[in-house]
Curated annotation (Swiss-Prot):
GO terms for biological process: rRNA catabolic process; rRNA processing; tRNA processing. Phosphorolytic 3'-5' exoribonuclease that plays an important role in tRNA 3'-end maturation. Removes nucleotide residues following the 3'-CCA terminus of tRNAs; can also add nucleotides to the ends of RNA molecules by using nucleoside diphosphates as substrates, but this may not be physiologically important. Probably plays a role in initiation of 16S rRNA degradation (leading to ribosome degradation) during starvation. The gene is rph. Homohexameric ring arranged as a trimer of dimers. Phosphate binds at R86, G124, T125, R126. Keywords: Nucleotidyltransferase, RNA-binding, rRNA processing, Transferase, tRNA processing, tRNA-binding. This is Ribonuclease PH. Belongs to the RNase PH family. InterPro entries: ExoRNase_PH_dom1, ExoRNase_PH_dom2, ExoRNase_PH_dom2_sf, PNPase/RNase_PH_dom_sf, Ribosomal_Su5_D2-typ_SF, RNase_PH, RNase_PH_bac-type, RNase_PH_CS. It catalyses: tRNA(n+1) + phosphate = tRNA(n) + a ribonucleoside 5'-diphosphate. It comes from Geotalea uraniireducens (strain Rf4). Its EC number is 2.7.7.56. One of its GO terms (molecular function) is 3'-5'-RNA exonuclease activity.
Length: 238
């Protein structure tokens, strides 16, 4: 039993609130326990220079964290004049994950800009961002389809992500901050709804992990992500 009462194979309570912001074409508040992220999808009628004239679209992402999303205040990256390495890595991961399930030809020469803003962090912010950003992206694209601006939905399938790790020798699903900070192994899995992997990230913080431990974490991730697909589907049906 974990300190928050969950079993090893349990997700935190996950909530997805759609249409959270007034102006964005797609927006959600996603909550993984005490981790809360606002994800928006904004549609622009142009593409980056390297795609101009090719008849294909683009999806990209930015990620940030409010200064007091964490236990102590962090400095805004804008005040430093540059994006940090961690932020750059996470926003590239979010963009890759969403592009993996898109048919860019159906999007035409449009861009969708995803913004993931962490308003409260308790572990798993990147995986929550991916899971929520998919729903925001779906809503933005569905709006274009309903207005007749797109002939068909460019999203081919769903994508979601979850963290897993080993804490005190036990594989755990969906780590919160306390668990993540003391984990011997920390992994993130990104999967599509056709049971294919987009990305697997894993690091041994202490002892190297075995193939058997890797398999156990993979199985936890697969079961957790299947549940996340169901939560996404339920949110989109509301």
């Amino acid at each position: 039993m974990r300190f928050d009462g969950r079993g090893a194979e349990s997700l935190r309570e996950v909530k997805i609130t759609r249409n959270y912001l007034k102006h964005a074409e797609g927006s959600v508040l996603i909550e993984f326990g005490d981790t809360k992220v606002i994800c928006t999808a904004s549609v622009e009628g142009s593409v980056p220079p390297f795609l101009r004239g090719k008849g294909t679209g683009w999806v990209t992402a930015e990620y940030s964290m409010l200064p007091r999303a964490t236990h102590t205040r962090s400095h805004r990256e804008s005040s430093k004049g540059k994006v940090g390495g961690r932020t750059h890595e996470i926003q590239r991961l979010i963009g890759r994950s969403l592009r993996a399930v898109m048919d860019m030809n159906l999007l035409g020469e449009r861009s969708v800009l995803i913004d993931c803003d962490v308003i409260q962090a308790d572990g798993g912010t990147r995986t929550a961002s991916i899971t929520g950003a998919y729903v925001a992206l779906y809503d933005a694209l569905d709006g274009l389809v309903k207005k007749g601006e797109l002939a068909a939905m460019p999203l081919k399938e769903a994508v979601a992500a979850v963290s897993v790790g080993i804490v005190d020798g036990t594989p755990l699903l969906d780590l919160n901050y306390v668990e993540d900070s003391s984990a011997e192994v920390d992994m993130n899995f990104v999967m599509t709804s056709s049971n294919r992997f987009v990305e697997v990230q894993g690091t041994a913080e202490a002892e190297p992990f075995t193939v058997e431990q890797m398999d156990a974490m993979r199985d936890l991730a697969i079961s957790g992500i299947k549940r996340l697909f169901q939560i996404q589907k339920e949110a989109l049906c509301q």
